[in-house]
Design a protein with these regions (language model features):
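Bacterial N-terminal signal peptides that target proteins for export
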Residues: 1-9
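Bacterial N-terminal signal peptides
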Residues: 9-19
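A eukaryote-biased signal for short, well-structured alpha-helical docking elements
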Residues: 21-36
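Extracellular/periplasmic metallocenter environments
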Residues: 26-29, 107-156
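N-terminal edge beta-strand
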Residues: 33-62
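Short beta-strand and strand-turn-strand segments in soluble, beta-rich domains
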Residues: 47, 102-111
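Beta-strand cores of secreted/periplasmic/IMS beta-sandwich domains, seen most often
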Residues: 54-79, 123-131, 135-136, 153-154
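Short aromatic-acidic-glycine turn motif
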Residues: 83-96
């Protein structure tokens, strides 16, 4: 029985990354789940489009989404649980400037969201890909949601 404890403990330790945070004279250890894959989405110039417009990832994958804003306007990336909520989220975003135009009062309707990326800035968000289906990712900066969106396809 003791032979199994060491390999299992080692496997669990290998699946978790740790970050160290200095807090005065002591160090605090934070466990973080390992990232399975990194996806890069970009915005360029003055066009209100994400590139690529479609992504496919296996459900349950832990993703680091890196958004590179090479555009001339600020943008964010928001993944709602349902495309039916996008219009309401976009309206609520107008009053959410303090939170990067992400309506945090509606946080339960969101799978993931980035901070606001100024032109030339790169931001990241980490999330677990939801159950199989199609999910829309959208920019909720005022006036962008009608044309700046893409599709995240969650695969089995």
């Amino acid at each position: 029985m003791s032979r199994l404890v060491i390999p299992i403990a080692a496997a669990v330790a290998a699946a978790v990354l740790f970050t160290v945070e200095p807090t005065g004279e002591r160090l605090r250890l934070h466990a973080q789940a390992a990232i399975d894959t990194t996806i890069v989405i970009k915005a360029s110039g003055s066009s209100l489009e994400f590139s690529p417009p479609r992504l496919s990832v296996t459900n349950g994958t832990r993703v680091r989404l890196r958004f590179v804003n090479d555009g001339t306007l600020p943008h964010n990336v928001v993944i709602p649980r349902s495309a039916e909520d996008i219009d309401d989220l976009a309206l609520d975003a107008y009053g959410a400037g303090e939170t990067g135009y992400v309506p945090l009062a509606d946080k339960d309707k969101l799978i993931a969201y980035s901070t606001l990326a100024s032109p030339g800035q790169t931001v990241e968000v980490t999330f677990v890909v939801p159950p199989p289906g199609e999910y829309t990712y959208v920019c909720l900066f005022p006036g962008h949601a009608n044309s700046m969106f893409g599709t995240l396809r969650s695969l089995r």
